[in-house]
């Protein structure tokens, strides 16, 4: 009873500390959520999943028509499509999902800390050892930080810790439920990090197996090990099968993403052990423990028990040999984030080390040598570390550990308080480095900005635009680049469709079209961030008829003023689906240069076989645009240096500065200015950004994780009637602008391209189904601005037809003259196979339960 009271006090203290630490980390006036990644991905995608569930009632969705033009929803499964944490939020329709996700993240963190404590206590560690180790786990680099940033990095931890308990239960009581259930929930919460989690579970499983055999005084034979190992692996495999409905279609979606880019690596680099102190220790993107962890792993190699040595060696190899990090990151890159799932296992090894140290079961030589080795290693790595402060902290940490280890060998008093003496400084150093990381990043969302971004008044403006129009068009929210970043995936209404997307997985054709074919501006340093475009031609092509904005937008007419922003309308925007016979072939399109490669979409659809040549297109478009001068004013004032060269400009800016550039006057109506040039970065480790009339292009540092390779800056900016100048903002840096071309013109309002408009059935169009009618005046092509995917199934009047890629990246098919009922159904590749696999997993679980019941009888 006394022990249970002590446990309860520890658990209450751990929960209180967790909540306090999370709230303290937000600072003054902020929320427990970060800008960009959290606000535009980890809180927004769950809201969209819930929104689609309410609209369709489908628990297993397949298509996300609303985001990124319309994509396989398993491109976004990483963000919690079937996560039990997210699914609970479905039961709270009146609570903003972003509010729920903040609370859920703190609850998950507290649950993980408590379960870890209970697991350690169940392994017969003292309450002090278990509690202090749980505190170390709480303050480890990624735990609090990622709970408000990249929540998928850590929100699976309760289920992972639960599964470690399940392994103990499996070997001690021969019960599989907790092992299978915990693994299944971990996968469903974060399939990406579950791979590392399963590897950690496997290592611990081997350790527990050997220890169980030793206690039972049984010999381990090769045959017995293989047989028992297969039975254990069978439980893990059953959990994987249960998650088949998530894993199979997600794998198919990832395999279809041919546009993914990985780091170049060689075999020697992958197999050579490396310890990057700044990434491996303390950081939020790795296990994030102190240098004590290195000491413990090295000391473990000298333990007496073979299985204890194997566990330490296994962890050391996985953590230091880049091959494992590379493999756990899907063979894309070598980054320590995939090693975060080893954190609970490292905490177990810490508790084990403290127990042995206190009971003097580690020889003095084997206790001191690892400490000395780590101190020397850290000292020698001084020049390799970017932060001298962190180097000093690491060295101090290692020296303190060395001194405590020496002192406890001679002092019974220190041995009595050994856990506090060893882990106290470690926890303090984790808190200090954690606070430093929070302060340095400074990217938490302010409460004021959060309330503005999630204000229902914006949603009401979107609702009004949709309700006013019975057609099939897109409605987008536009602000400055920071606001646009927050709203990359935000959808307010299940009938709102947007072109933007920010996801680690995406439709490769759509991404390639934006970047290489059409050459949309890239305002962000991360190539995955596909922003709303300010290009009026792209907006017209993609059917962006309505914009919600607080600024006047050339080419759009203000319709209404609302509390959430003004509603602007462009009556000339293309429908999302229409029929036309004005076509040109892909081969001819590929011959077009800028800006004809963009303007062609105002007059023609690009198909496999077209009717006009590139020359004819240029001749036709010459009616709308003409080449013009675009001269940047030269300047040399000590802060800004802009000098013209034979082929462009040499620029050296100490800070961002704005210039006024003359352009041909728009005499009759709003027009468009097209500008394109190449950029050569003289300081490639720094970013470059240049804006024209607020439309920004950015070239990221070559060292950036998601380097965007944006070396050609392309602009198409709207000009108002009578406008004679434009604002050009040159960002800080040293670079060359060359091969510049500029054109000025108007967008022709009557090109006859949209000959027959698809009338969508808004009641039937939801989930993975698009349905409606069209009255085609003549034979032609049915054109959409929905990205092409092999999962589409099309029927005309109930007859299945073959779909093809049109406009280089979108869905289309041949259509004969007449009245037709169109039905477009999307089947995510792998969904059926995934459901079958899940069904087999359920049958295996049921069969196992029945068999166990019969054996018990």
Question: Positions of the model-derived regions?
Answer:
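Transmembrane signal-anchor helices characteristic of membrane glycosylation enzymes that use polyprenol
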Residues: 6-39, 44, 237-249, 428-430
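Active-site-proximal, structured, solvent-exposed surfaces of multi-pass membrane proteins
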Residues: 2-4, 45-46, 626-857
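Membrane-embedded helix bundles of polyisoprenyl
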Residues: 15-19, 105-119, 127-211, 231-251, ...
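Contiguous transmembrane helix-bundle modules in multi-pass membrane proteins
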Residues: 193, 307-320, 327-455, 819-857
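Periplasmic/ER-lumenal interhelical loops and adjacent helix-loop junctions
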Residues: 224-340, 382-389
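Membrane-interfacial loop-to-transmembrane alpha-helix junctions, especially the N-terminal start
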Residues: 7-10, 123-132, 169, 174-179, ...
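Extracytoplasmic/lumenal acceptor-recognition loop(s) of multi-pass membrane glycoenzymes
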Residues: 69, 78, 425-449, 466-540, ...
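Membrane-interface coil-to-helix junctions
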Residues: 18-113, 135-157, 196, 254-259, ...
């Amino acid at each position: 009873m006394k022990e249970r009271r002590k446990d309860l006090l520890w658990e209450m203290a751990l929960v209180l500390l967790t909540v306090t630490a999370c709230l303290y980390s937000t600072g003054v006036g902020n929320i427990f959520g970060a800008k960009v990644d959290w606000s535009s991905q980890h809180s927004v995608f769950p809201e969209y999943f819930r929104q689609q569930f309410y609209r369709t009632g489908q628990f297993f969705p397949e298509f996300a028509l609303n985001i990124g033009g319309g994509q396989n929803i398993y491109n976004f499964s990483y963000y919690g499509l079937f996560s039990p944490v997210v699914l609970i939020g479905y039961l709270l329709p009146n609570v903003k999902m972003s509010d729920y996700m903040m609370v859920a993240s703190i609850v998950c963190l507290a649950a993980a800390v408590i379960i870890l404590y209970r697991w350690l206590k169940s392994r017969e560690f003292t309450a002090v050892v278990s509690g202090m180790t749980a505190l170390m786990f709480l303050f480890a680099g990624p735990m609090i930080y990622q709970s408000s940033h990249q929540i998928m990095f850590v929100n699976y931890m309760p289920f992972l810790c639960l599964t470690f308990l399940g392994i103990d239960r499996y070997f001690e009581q021969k019960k599989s439920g907790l092992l299978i259930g915990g693994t299944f929930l971990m996968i469903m919460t974060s399939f990406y990090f579950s791979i590392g989690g399963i590897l950690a579970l496997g290592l611990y499983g081997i350790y527990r197996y050997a220890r169980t055999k030793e206690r039972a005084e049984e010999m381990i034979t090769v045959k017995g090990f293989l047989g028992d190992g297969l039975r254990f692996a069978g439980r893990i495999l059953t959990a994987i099968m249960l998650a088949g409905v998530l894993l199979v279609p997600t794998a198919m979606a990832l395999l279809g993403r041919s546009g993914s880019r990985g780091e170049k690596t060689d075999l020697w680099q992958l197999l050579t052990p490396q310890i990057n102190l700044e990434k491996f220790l303390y950081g939020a993107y790795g296990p994030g423990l102190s240098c004590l962890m290195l000491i413990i792993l090295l000391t473990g190699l000298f333990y007496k028990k073979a299985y204890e040595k194997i566990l330490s060696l296994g962890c050391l190899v996985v953590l230091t040999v880049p091959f494992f990090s590379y493999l756990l990151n899907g063979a894309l890159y070598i980054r320590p984030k995939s090693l975060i799932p080893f954190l609970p296992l490292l905490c177990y090894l810490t508790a084990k080390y403290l127990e042995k140290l206190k009971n003097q079961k580690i020889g003095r030589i084997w206790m001191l040598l690892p400490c000395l080795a780590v101190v020397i290693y850290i000292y020698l790595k001084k020049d390799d570390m970017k932060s001298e402060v962190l180097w000093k902290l690491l060295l101090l940490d290692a020296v303190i550990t060395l001194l405590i280890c020496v002192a406890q060998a001679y002092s019974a008093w220190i041995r009595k308080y050994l856990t506090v003496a060893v882990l106290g400084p470690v926890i303090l150093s984790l808190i200090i480095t954690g606070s430093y990381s929070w302060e340095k990043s400074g990217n938490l969302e302010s409460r004021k900005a959060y309330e503005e971004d999630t204000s229902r008044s914006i949603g009401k403006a979107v609702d009004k635009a949709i309700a006013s129009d019975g057609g099939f068009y897109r409605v987008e929210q536009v602000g400055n680049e920071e606001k646009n970043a927050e709203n990359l995936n935000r959808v307010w209404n299940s009938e709102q469709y947007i072109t933007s997307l920010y996801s680690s997985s995406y439709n490769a054709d759509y991404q390639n079209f934006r970047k290489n074919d059409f050459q949309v501006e890239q305002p962000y340093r991360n190539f995955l961030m596909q922003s709303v475009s300010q290009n009026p031609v792209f907006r017209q092509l993609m059917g962006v008829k309505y914009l919600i904005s607080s600024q006047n937008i050339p080419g759009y007419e203000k319709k209404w003023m609302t509390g959430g922003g003004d509603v602007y309308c462009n009556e000339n925007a293309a429908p999302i689906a229409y029929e036309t016979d004005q076509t040109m072939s892909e081969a001819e399109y590929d011959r077009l240069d800028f800006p004809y490669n963009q303007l062609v979409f105002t007059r023609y659809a690009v198909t496999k076989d077209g009717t006009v040549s590139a020359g004819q297109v240029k001749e036709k478009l010459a009616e709308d645009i003409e080449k013009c001068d675009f001269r940047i004013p030269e300047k040399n004032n000590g802060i800004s240096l802009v000098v013209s060269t034979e082929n462009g400009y040499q620029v050296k800016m100490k800070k961002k500065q704005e210039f006024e550039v003359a352009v041909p006057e728009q005499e009759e109506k709003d027009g468009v200015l097209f500008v394109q040039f190449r950029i050569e970065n003289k300081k490639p480790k720094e970013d470059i950004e240049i804006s024209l009339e607020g439309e920004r292009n950015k070239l990221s540092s070559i060292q950036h994780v998601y380097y965007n390779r944006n070396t050609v800056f392309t602009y198409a900016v709207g000009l108002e009637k009578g406008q004679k100048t434009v604002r050009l903002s040159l960002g800080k840096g040293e670079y060359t602008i060359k091969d510049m071309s500029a054109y000025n013109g108007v967008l022709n309002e009557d090109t006859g391209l949209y000959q027959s408009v698809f009338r969508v059935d808004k009641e039937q169009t939801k989930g993975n189904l698009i349905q409606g009618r069209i009255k085609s005046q003549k034979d032609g092509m049915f054109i959409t601005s929905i990205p092409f995917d092999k999962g589409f199934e099309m029927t005309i009047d109930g007859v299945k037809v073959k779909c093809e890629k049109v406009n280089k990246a979108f869905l289309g098919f041949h259509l004969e003259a007449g009245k037709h009922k169109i039905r477009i159904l999307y089947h995510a590749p792998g969904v059926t196979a995934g459901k079958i696999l899940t069904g087999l997993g359920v049958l295996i679980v049921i069969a196992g339960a029945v068999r166990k019941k019969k054996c018990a009888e």
